[in-house]
């Protein structure tokens, strides 16, 4: 577990970078039970003995089908060399990944009280405002992909709108250029791409009379989900997000290499 990996010097629990992801674990085609009575009625309401009372029906969005079993939520050390698992937890199959994160994270903290999470990497299924707020309260950097169904392309101010990647766009529809971050005021600075002399960009539309061009200041506190630190268009964000697949590889190792679904499951 996490403590053993710490003793071996494989992970650093004091500065832990977590990647989380859930995957389906099929245990049976239906709910398995045996009757405890001698009733002749097939659909009697007498008590039954269930071999897996904590399983239910879930939906596999990648294969577009329902299944019966568990949802395995895996938390891995994203900054480890071998995608080491920190804390896996079997939840009900019907549990969404955003809820699975909450259950697994707090269960992990109960077992690994010394774990200090500094950063967490998640896919778009976790693109929920409450998760960003929780991470901010606990000083955790949240690297989460945007979910377009949550609403991202919208008019934010009279002078600019927000594009699908969370970056401001000017009235001409051009993506503005990030020009720094003010830590004291907690806001990003964006400038006109035409005035900034970006390659391949030419615009005849004048958004500002200033020779400096249109400047937009975006406070991150206005919308933690859209305006992240680091910004989603930065190299830092992309490099960190690439580590997220460690949880997917760890799930594959559990399901395929160790044949988790082939075992006889009983809870």
Residue ranges with predicted function:
Residues 156-185, 220-266:
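Short amphipathic alpha-helical "interface-anchor" segments enriched in bulky aromatics
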Residues 1-120, 124-137, 147:
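Polybasic low-complexity intrinsically disordered regions
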Residues 81-83, 166, 173, 200:
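Detector for glycine-centered tight turns/loop "hinges" at secondary-structure junctions
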Residues 98-194, 231:
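An internal, acidic/charged active-site-proximal segment
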Residues 189-230:
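Long, low-complexity, polar/charged, intrinsically disordered or flexibly structured peripheral segments
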Residues 34-36, 41-43, 54, 157, ...:
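Mature extracytoplasmic/luminal segments of secretory-pathway proteins
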Residues 11-13, 67, 185, 209-211, ...:
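A generic structural signal for short, non-catalytic loop/turn and secondary-structure boundary residues
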């Amino acid at each position: 577990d996490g403590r053993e990996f710490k003793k071996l010097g494989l992970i650093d629990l004091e500065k832990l970078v977590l990647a989380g992801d859930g995957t389906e674990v099929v245990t049976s085609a239906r709910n398995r039970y045996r009757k405890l009575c001698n009733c002749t009625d097939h659909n009697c309401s007498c008590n039954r003995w269930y071999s897996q009372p904590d399983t239910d029906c879930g939906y596999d969005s990648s294969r577009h089908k329902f299944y019966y079993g568990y949802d395995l939520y895996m938390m891995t050390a994203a900054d480890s060399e071998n995608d080491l698992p920190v804390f896996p937890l079997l939840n009900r199959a019907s549990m969404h990944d955003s809820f699975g994160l909450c259950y697994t994270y707090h269960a992990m903290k109960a077992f690994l009280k010394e774990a200090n999470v500094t950063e967490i990497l998640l896919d778009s299924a976790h693109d929920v405002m409450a998760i960003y707020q929780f991470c901010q309260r606990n000083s955790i950097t949240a690297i989460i992909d945007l979910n377009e169904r949550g609403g991202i392309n919208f008019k934010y101010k009279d002078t600019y709108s927000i594009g699908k990647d969370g970056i401001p766009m000017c009235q001409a529809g051009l993506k503005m250029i990030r020009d720094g971050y003010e830590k004291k005021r907690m806001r990003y600075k964006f400038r006109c791409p035409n005035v900034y002399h970006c390659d391949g960009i030419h615009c005849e539309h004048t958004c500002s009379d200033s020779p400096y061009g249109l400047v937009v200041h975006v406070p991150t506190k206005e919308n933690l989900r859209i305006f992240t630190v680091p910004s989603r268009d930065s190299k830092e964000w992309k490099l960190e997000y690439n580590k997220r697949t460690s949880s997917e590889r760890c799930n594959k190792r559990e399901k395929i290499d160790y044949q988790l679904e082939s075992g006889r499951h009983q809870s």
